[in-house]
Design a protein with these regions (language model features):
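An N-terminal assembly and electron-transfer interface module characteristic of large anaerobic redox
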Residues: 1-210
Length: 210
């Protein structure tokens, strides 16, 4: 376990019968206690089910139940959260405990809104904007109530996607912690909700004021 860099689980297979035990003694549960103590001594994080000893069928069930846990651990160990701007005053309770995120394997990149605004302005006139506007028009259909801002929304989406690719580093997954008020709308000229939902649908979760 010390040299395995993936998600780890410890369980013990109980003896199938007492016929072949030395003096009738089984070591599955005792071995599990010993293993858990040694994991703590070595600061190795491993998942141990509530009752980790069972027969073959029980152990198979425990392994099956570990699959979503392992996926979550693997995801966190390959996740980078890119943030823009501090939380607004009224959202102070939503301030993320960054130290604890690092403790569970998440990488954090903090940026200012000014960094984002600069990158957004540098994307003005990007040759990819017209094609993205057309895609948005087709997606919105009759819901396209403000066609005049689509070019800015496309510019913003390209800004975020380029930022993600340039800053993800070795991480497979990226999430964005953004900010949409109070100054965002007046300075950028739009609200980012539509772009946030589009990026989330593309596998880049975005949330504001978190």
């Amino acid at each position: 376990a010390k040299h395995f860099d993936g998600p780890k689980m410890f369980i013990a297979a109980a003896e199938e019968s007492g016929n072949d035990l030395l003096d009738g003694r089984g070591d599955a549960y005792c071995g599990m206690l010993n293993a858990s103590y040694n994991l703590k001594l070595r600061n190795i994080n491993a998942y141990i089910p509530e009752y980790p000893v069972g027969d073959a069928e029980d152990c198979a069930d425990m392994i099956h139940e570990f699959i979503p846990i392992a996926k979550a651990i693997e995801g966190l160990n390959n996740l980078k959260i890119i943030s823009f701007g501090p939380r607004p005053l009224n959202f102070l309770a939503c301030n993320a405990p960054i130290k604890q995120l690092y403790n569970i394997g998440v990488e954090i990149e903090e940026n200012s809104e000014l960094d984002l605004f600069e990158a957004f302005n540098k994307h003005a006139g990007d040759e990819r904007i017209p094609a993205l506007v057309k895609e948005m028009e087709e997606e919105l259909g009759v819901g396209n109530k403000k066609p005049e801002i689509l070019s800015k929304l496309a510019q913003y989406e390209l800004t975020l996607k380029d930022w993600v690719e340039e800053h993800r580093g070795y991480r497979k997954y990226v999430a964005i912690a953004g900010k949409c008020w109070p100054a965002f709308q007046t300075q950028f000229g739009f609200v980012p909700c539509y772009v946030n939902s589009r990026l989330t649908a593309q596998g880049i979760p975005v949330s504001c004021e978190v």
